[in-house]
Amino acid sequence: MNERNIIETQPERTDLPLIVIPVIVESMIEPFAANFPLLHDIARIRMHCDFTLDTDTILERTKDAEAVIVIGFHITDDILDAMTVRGHVSCFAFGGTGVASYINLPVARERGIRVCNVVHYGDHAVAEHAFALIMELARQVGRLDEQVRRG
């Protein structure tokens, strides 16, 4: 990865904590970057603008982080050890739901690691999905869609 694939705010402000987004899907780059000014003078942000599930790459990208925003990858116990016991990470913020599926919460709690969700992440998607389920139950749109597609 070259430097053009990294968006970093206030790199000279080493007095501020570093938040790292080690992986992200392309459609989320602009929405995330648009909110970076909210953290001006609060934290530095380093966002790697690609997606990988390679553990070594994720660990390399987060080696200086104090907080990590987790989107689409699991924090295994080995990764948790590397980032918290041998590293500097004290907080994981998850961009999604089902946090307990992505990290061992009792181990994180035992180590004093904060684990939280990104505020309002997926609010619209949850509401849209709820209405889709209502339409399926009320009008069986899935079955009818299948019939139309079959002719």
Model-inferred region functions:
Residues 66-150:
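Phosphate/diphosphate ligand-binding glycine-rich loop within oxidoreductases
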